[in-house]
Amino acid sequence: MKIKLLSTLICLLLSISLSAYDGRHGWPTQKAPQKIIICNNQNLSHAESMLLESLSGLCGQAVNDGTFDEMVWIEFTNTSYHKILKSSLKSLNISKPTRMNVWELLDYLKRKKIVKGYILYKADVSKGENYSRRQGINYSSNVATVYAGLLQGILVEESLENRIKATGLRKLKDARNESPEDCFTHCKDQLNRHSALSIDPKVSNCRDIAIAQKLMLYYDTGRFSEQILEWVTPLSPILGWNCGNEAEYTGAITRWGHYNTASNWCQNLPVIMAASDKMIPLPVHEKSIDEINLKDSSAFHSFVISDGDNMQWTMGEFLDSPVYYGNKDKNQSPVSWTLCPVNLSVVSTSTWNRFVSMKKDNSSVIEYGGGYQYPDEFAKNRPNREELLTEFARRMNWHFKKLNIKIFGFICKDVFSEEARQAYEIYAREIEGLTGMIAIQYNPYNMGGDMLWVKNKKNVEIPVVTAKFSIWSGLFHNPLCGGPDYVAALINRDAAKAIKEKEKYNPLSWTIIHAWSDFSKTATSIDQPIKGYKASKTSDDLLSPLVKNVSMNELLWRIRARHNTKHNVSYFVK
């Protein structure tokens, strides 16, 4: 009985603590600098890139501590990041950033007493690609990164030690023989419990934010990663990426009540976050029901691009790639985009605002999960799953109202499970103004267009609609999945069948397009490569006159109107 009362009390106290939401979706705060130092990473060795990341991280930490007023932008060749830098400098009111190379920067920060010494590590040279599961991985760069944040030391690989010693810096820690498990045991009480970084020891990206925010690092799945995810405060962003089965490591993150940010190739997060706090996120425009001709009883279809919960992609090339949102099509085909509006609006506001300014009225934006997570597994390892689901949904509501997001989408392990339905009911109840929700099955993506209905706070039914078809290369076992031309034929077939058999209603359905699938060798189009937006465009061009391609928001309104034929428009918007 005492245990039960104690559990109830803990849940009550957590509920009170969660109620004061700060609008950051778990992301830490990075204070703003007065000056920016730009350091180019071209032609640097891997060891120098790691060194540079640590210098940037120490500056971010010092600014947070109020002992310094300068931060570092690591310059590299990327159009989108160049635009983010320009916007960030404007937001921070910095007109003339300073330029230094990595060794000038080290000397400068040493003189400013930002660097107290160095942490020694050994580079991982295990055979295999980045973010692969490899034999004999050396984890000392990850251990060193943890100590760099705690001891204010730079990351120094063995090959650079003599050069660093010559500067007069002392060795603060030799991380070469300490395991990640021992590091966690020694350091966890000093670390930030509101996030963690999953990162390949080979990779330098994101070590700046890990050092600035004093985060724990891990890599691979298993008991140790589970230990860290349990330790991290629920409802936190887990940075980076991992190796092995995507469903396995994202599932682990989800079951402990967190979300995967898919941010492993992000750059300069400390500076971008600091600048974003001085920007106002723009609301996006979506069609309202009174802008839609509901008397038109044609067959309607929507195409949706997947993987928008991938932060590193949306920040890195999404807006400028002609294959995706940077397409130059003058007569843009209606296509809707899964995206991470909540995370972008907090972390990279300039990226989000660019998207809003570029958005066409015939498209929709779908918040994809509030981060990569599986609603049916969310917080299953915690004793208060329902409470955490509710608080997560309330966060979504706060951001959805601010950004005018109308559609919540997500991937589930089992779309129609009791646990999934519980999540949908909480989402519908807590997120105001939803037009509807779209659900993807992890495998297969499409579930034949089946749907279910859940009620919002006003007792209005909200649909959760699965994709009828998927455009995904190489999945030959799925009869409702194929290339753009094959799926267009299926859509046309359904519309023709409805007329031929005098069905009561014409089809209202949608297709999920796998963002990375390339159909250049199998589909017919002169506009290459056929992937992303161009896959949608190819399929749209092949639709019969019986089918009208519309945004997902319009499709959801039509589904709701058909489901509630006895009600007028005021019923849906009350």
PLM region spans:
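Bacterial N-terminal signal peptides
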Residues: S7-S17
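Short, aromatic/basic amphipathic alpha-helical patches
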Residues: G128-L150, A247-T261, T351-F355, Q422-Y427, ...
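Preference for solvent-exposed, low-hydrophobicity sequence contexts
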Residues: Y21-S276
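Short loop/turn segments at strand-loop or loop-helix junctions that form parts
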Residues: K122, S298-G308, L339-C340, I366-Y374, ...
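Catalytic grooves of carbohydrate-active enzymes
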Residues: G222, E226-W241, S306-Q332, V342, ...
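Substrate-binding cleft of extracellular glycoside hydrolase catalytic domains
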Residues: C340-I405
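Active-site beta->alpha N-cap acidic-glycine motif
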Residues: L269-R354
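Bacterial N-terminal signal peptides that target proteins for export
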Residues: M1-S7
